[in-house]
Amino acid sequence: MNGEYRWLSSLNNLPACLQRTRCADWGVLNMHVAIFVTVVAIVVGFAAPTCANDRPSDPFGNDTIELNKETALVEMWESLRDQVLLDRAHFRSCIESNNQSNDTDCAAVSTLMKIVEEARQNQGKALLGHLNRSINLLINAAPGYLTGPLEVITVRNGDCKSHSIAKYGAARAAGFSADHVRLVTVHDRRHNFDHMVAVVFYNGEWLILDNLTNLLVRDTEKRDYAPLAVLDYKGVRRYRSPYWMID
């Protein structure tokens, strides 16, 4: 895994520890409805909460502070949200063409919705487990960077960031509130590399969707993951004490 996680190397104004990184077809009507739901879910997921009064504290503990807007990670995250807005235009184009376009983005829309619709045959943890496993199987391990969900699904290659972004979008499309889906960069203390995961709040606990395993694990159980920063529609926050967990 050496050399695969370079994306935080240019960060400034962050603690030194934050600078070490590795990190089918279906009916036309159903497609119209499914794509519309996905457009709303993904775009809104990067912009606003579903319920303003239903926001749990951050995973891995709540001792976080906002990063300065000039910090490189913040700039990258804001750029990613701009890319998601471009994805919305591609979704609309697919709707107008009844998904008959040869555009690769329409193929990505179809792939994403197939994963989400299959996951919706389950509930709760089983739904999230299906999303995690399906995206892990879809994306091949390769060096990656922060980009929108459609590009990730189109290329089908990427690292932990690519998996996490795709899972973020898929969880939102599956109906989870923007307040209940976040991305977290962590330091794997056991293997000594930095990593990114998607986390989803369900039934009072944060569940980790990780490209390194198909199993869902609670944040409180993953003692070898020391949190570094958390990203969501509100912005980017870092943990005051990155290595907050005590052996």
Regions found by a protein language model. Name each.
Residues 37-45:
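Bacterial N-terminal signal peptides
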Residues 5-6, 18, 23, 47:
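Generic alpha-helical structural signal
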Residues 5-7, 14, 49-247:
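A structural boundary/capping signal
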